[in-house]
Structures are given as C-alpha cells and as structure tokens.
Design a protein with these regions (language model features):
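Pre-ATPase regulatory/linker segments immediately N-terminal to the P-loop/RecA-like helicase/translocase core
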Residues: 5-9, 70-194, 255, 261, ...
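Conserved helix-turn-beta segment of the N-terminal RecA-like "Helicase ATP-binding" lobe
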Residues: 239-270, 484-493
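Conserved helicase motor core of SF1/SF2 NTP-dependent helicases
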Residues: 226-229, 235-239, 298-589
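Hydrophobic anchor at the beta1->P-loop junction of P-loop NTPases
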Residues: 205, 233
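Walker A/P-loop NTP-binding motif
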Residues: 201, 214-229, 247-249
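A helicase ATPase "motif cassette" and its flanking acidic/Ser/Thr-rich regulatory loops
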Residues: 1-74, 98, 102
Length: 589
C-alpha cells in the first residue's frame, strides 16, 4: 500500500492486510531473535544480562543489580525474565530503573524461592501480538457513525478543505485573544492554536525541531478543557504521552482534571496522578466539567472502556501508523495531530523504508490536504544550526528565534590544547565536522570513540555540565565503546548525567552540545547499511538536537563510497551537504 484508495472498502482491506503482514513478520523476527545466544541478543540491544537478584520490595517487584544498561530496554517496557539454568521465562514489566538497579514487576506474583540462585538472571524484550486489537478497530470502522462520518472521509480525502463560516468566526476570536497576549506567541503558533480551537473535524500541527510544538499542544488542551471538553492525549510511546500530559497539566493547574491511565510504573514527582481504570479516577465524578485523560490507544478497550471523548489529541503523530491512530480516533469526533513527517516515522518491519512513511497517519492526512500549520520559529537551534535543516527539510521557512540565533558555546576554551581541539570547541564554529581516515570500521570505531571521549573531557573541564551534552550514534556498540573510554578518562560520578545513545532515543530531546559519531567506514558495510546510515529523517533528528554546537565525527570513506543507487546517492549527498556547511578539522593532523 503506497497511498490510500478513494474506495472505503479498499482502504480498510489495505490496512487489514498491512496489520496481518506486520504481525507475521514481527513474529518471525522475534523467534529468530530469541534463537540467538544471549551474548548476541545483548549486542543487538534486546537483552540485558548479568542481573543479580537483591530483594523483593514492598510492591512485589524483584530488584536486580546490574553492571550498566546498554540495551534499548527502558521503564515501562514489557520483558521476559529468564535464568541461565532454567528454560522457563517469566513475563513482566520494567517498573523502575535507578543507576545500577532495575525493578521488575511480574505478570504473576513473584515468590522468594524463585530467586534462590541470585546471579545468572537476564531480561529480554517481550513480544505481544497486538494484531487482534488493530483488526477489531478496522472491523468497527465501517459500521459505526464515527467511522463512516468522521474517520473514513479524512482517509479518503473527502473532508472539507477549508473552514466553514462558524469555524472562521471562532478562528478569528481565538487568534485575536492570543494576539492580545503581547509577546507570548509567534504568528504560526497563534495560527495553529486558533485553528485547533476553531476546527470541527481535524487539524494538523507540524512542529519542526524546537518550535514549541508541546507548548502549543498544552495551550490547546487547556482551552479545550476550559470550555468543558473531554480530551484524550495519546501517542506511540509512553514517553511522548507523559511529556505531553505533563505540559498540559502545568497549563491546566488542577490535578483533579488530569489523569494518566495505564499499568503502574514508577513515577518521579509528576504533576498528574496515574490510575489503572477510569472509575478509580476523579475524572469519573467531574460531571460536565472538562478534563484530560492520557493513555495509549490500547488502554481504551479496558481502562477507559465506554468513555467518549470530544477531542482526540495525538502527539508525535509522525511515528503513529494509521491502524493505531484509528484505534484512538474511534473514541472521539475531533482530531488534533501534532508531529513532523520530516523526523522519525513509524516503526514498521514488513515494508521497505521508502514505503513506511505512507503508512503513518500524519503523512496520510497531509497528503489528503487536511487543514494544517507548520510552526516556523525554532527556540532551540542557533542561526548556523538552523540553516541546514531549514533548507533541506522545511522549504527554507524555519528560522531561529531572536534569542536563539546568536547563542554560542560559553565555556572556557583551554589554551594548552591541540589546534584541532581549539577548532572543535571554538564558540564561533557552531557546526564542526571532524574527518577521520579509518577504513575498516563497522558498528564501532575506536578512533572516533577516543576522540569523542577527549572532547567530552575537554568540555567537562571547561565548565560544561554532563547533562548539557550528549553523544548520538547509529549503533549501540559505539555507544558502549565511548562509555568504556570515558571510564578511563573521567571519574564515573562526573559524567553520570551524560546521555550516549541512538537517534531513536534522542528524538524530542535537546542539549547545548551534541556529538554525532557515525563510525562506519568499511566499504561493503556502508553499502549494506546505506538505507539506514543515510536515512534523511534520522539525519534530521540527529542534526537538530543541539542548541549551540554540533560536532560530527565521520570517516571520509562514508561519503566517498559509491552506492550505485540514485535514491541512496541523493541521501548520501544530503550528508555531504551537511559537511559543506561545517567547519572541517581533523585530529590526525
């Protein structure tokens, strides 16, 4: 399926076929993954090994000590807990993680006797076949009023393209009210908020990096709640849901009208409360007063069963597939989608990368000319760091805010350092590209790891706090190598707040300084991984996390390898264009 058909039955059949195909491929890949030895699963980031059982806490969670979590497993993830001497595995959830300890909440109650042998434990990511939930939503779609009158017309491009007279009037009132708040909002932010408040059916807000998308979302939710609406905030990930709800809760300022629904995980001083079921929450007794609930689309079946919403707000909609979005949209009649199709798209394993974008709800509705606004002022990127993404992803329309444009690195540059280090840390060089001549690196590069660690040490001793910098890399192996190198250069406590992770983990985050280590250089490997390495959306995310300085470490062979595919060559050219915008140096000089 590359685009939606204008025939409703074909739309639904295409989506149903995609759901079934995706579930089958996921099932096969998971079986192949679990057939691998533990050490290979650890390398892939799907397993955390060498767990040592310490205790059962008062909530029944098993608490384990570990040597460091280099996996992609995080709080809220479903896992299987296994032991090297046992075949059986236990289903559970990562309830909490702190430093070198991890809490596992079981599906069934743990018994102390299960942990007679304290060492030898490991956790793997779990697989759940959720296709029945998707198929159930698609089955309901053509037979219900919301499906027939609200959702299918959107997917088929039959919704009204402009505002009607009533919407126009409401838009003008909302816009004028925002304009009276002197200096609070940019023009396109006011347009987005007014559009969301006025529209009767659907509105899209595209939020390029650092443009205040979440701030706009929170204001919209507050105003909807103030006029008595029941609002659902949902997203593809728990992190995105929590982030959006926290921002909305700050705006609303009334804990009794805000609730998060889902299985309990550890919360850290949140400004909202969590409940397992709607009936347990204060929302159930709010009557006609507006409120906001936040949950995954899957929670609507049991935790929020029978609850009708006025407005469905989908955050990070660029990452949500259309079937998952439909599951949420069936619970309400108005849809506000916040996202950016130029950043990371949906996670899909059954289709080639270039087909995945069309499977996302944000991309699909943009193609159907749904009413939309693109926020065009970034508060994150300075003037130099804004130029490249603006020209290559946002039609030259993205510009830095007045306060962000002149922002530069302010830490002291050590005068005794090598010339290449001075160039790298120079405040007047916000974008730096460090050339390397290694030629045999795949998923890790010792040269780049050593240089990245040296730069971090220099920044740290120049006064930059660890939490103000991060390292982004395509491969977990490189992240591990950089951490190990840092362990030899700095006391462990001094860089605890430093994030070293993959692009996927950094979407939505920002730091003053970002190091991007691309590491790959072996020609055959670069060709094999070209779709992944040169993915424009991943590159856009990686290049737009920094507020004041982006430092890219890459082998010259990454850019000179001939790919013999016109599409991939275009994407390789995009990376070359980023290098052309940079101050270029080399640590081999």
């Amino acid at each position: 399926m590359t685009a939606f058909s204008l025939d409703a039955s074909t739309v639904i059949d295409d989506l149903r076929a995609f759901v079934c195909e995706e579930a089958e491929v996921q099932r096969i890949r998971y079986a192949e993954q679990m057939a691998l030895p533990i050490n290979e699963r650890v390398e892939k980031g799907t397993c955390l090994d060498r767990l040592y059982f310490t205790r059962l806490d008062q909530q029944g969670c098993a608490v384990f000590r570990h040597e460091g979590n280099d996996s992609r497993l995080r709080e809220g993830d479903m896992i299987t807990l296994g032991h090297r001497s046992q075949d059986a595995a236990v289903q559970g959830t990562i309830y909490r993680e702190e430093s070198k300890e991890i809490w596992i909440s079981p599906e069934r109650q743990f018994r102390t006797a299960q942990f007679d042998i304290p060492d030898g434990w490991f956790i793997d990511e779990a697989f759940m076949d959720l296709s029945s939930h998707y198929l159930d939503a698609l089955d309901r779609l053509p037979g219900c009023e919301i499906g027939q009158e609200r959702i299918l017309p959107l997917l088929m491009g039959e919704a009204e393209p402009g505002f009607n007279e009533d919407e126009d009037n409401e838009y003008n009132v909302a816009y004028d009210e925002l304009a009276s708040e002197t200096g609070s909002w940019e023009d396109m932010q006011m347009e987005a908020i007014a559009g969301c408040m006025a529209v009767d059916h659907c509105y899209l807000v595209q939020g390029p990096p650092g443009t205040g998308k979440t701030h706009v979302l929170a204001r919209v939710v507050r105003q909807l709640v103030e006029r008595g609406e029941r609002v659902l905030i949902t997203a593809f990930t728990h992190r995105a849901i929590d982030h959006a709800l926290s921002a909305a809760a700050r705006e609303i300022g009334d804990r009794q009208r805000v609730a998060r629904f889902g299985k309990a995980i550890h919360r850290r001083d949140e400004n909202y409360d969590q409940f397992e079921y709607y009936a347990e929450s204060p929302l159930a007794s709010c009557g006609a007063v507006g409120w906001v609930a936040a949950a995954t689309p899957f929670a609507l079946k049991k935790r929020l069963a029978g609850v009708d919403f006025d407005t469905i707000v989908i955050d990070e909609a660029g990452q949500m597939t259309t079937p998952l979005a439909i599951m949420a949209m069936l619970a309400g009649k108005k849809y506000l989608l916040f996202g950016d199709q130029q950043q990371l798209g949906p996670v899909v394993v059954s289709r080639p990368r270039r087909e995945i974008e069309s499977l996302g709800i944000f991309h699909a509705l943009r193609n159907q000319k749904t009413k939309s606004t693109m926020l065009d002022v970034t508060y994150r990127l300075n003037d130099v760091l804004t130029e490249w993404p603006s020209e290559n992803f946002y039609q030259g329309e993205l510009r830095p805010a007045a306060l962000a444009a002149p922002r530069r690195l302010t830490c002291r540059i050590p005068t005794e350092d090598l010339e290449c280090m001075k160039t790298t840390l120079d405040p007047q060089a916000p974008l730096v590209w460090i050339d390397f001549d290694h030629h045999s690196a795949r998923t890790e590069s010792e040269d780049e790891a050593c240089t990245a660690a040296e730069i971090i040490r220099a920044l740290y001793y120049s006064g930059l706090k660890p939490e103000e910098m991060a390292v982004v890399t395509p491969y977990r192996r490189q992240a591990r190598r950089i951490r190990r190198r840092l362990e030899t250069l700095l006391p462990s406590q001094s860089w605890r707040g430093l994030v070293i992770d993959t692009v996927e983990r950094m979407q939505g985050q920002e730091r003053d300084v970002i190091l991007l280590s691309l590491c790959a250089s072996e020609t055959s490997f670069v060709k094999q991984q070209a779709e992944f390495l040169f993915d424009p959306h991943r590159l856009n995310v990686a290049a737009t996390r920094a507020r004041v300085k982006l430092i890219i470490l890459a082998s010259e062979l990454l850019l000179s390898t001939a790919l013999y595919d016109s599409d991939l060559e275009e994407e390789q050219d995009l990376l070359r264009s980023l290098r052309k915008c940079a101050t270029i140096t080399s640590f081999s000089e």
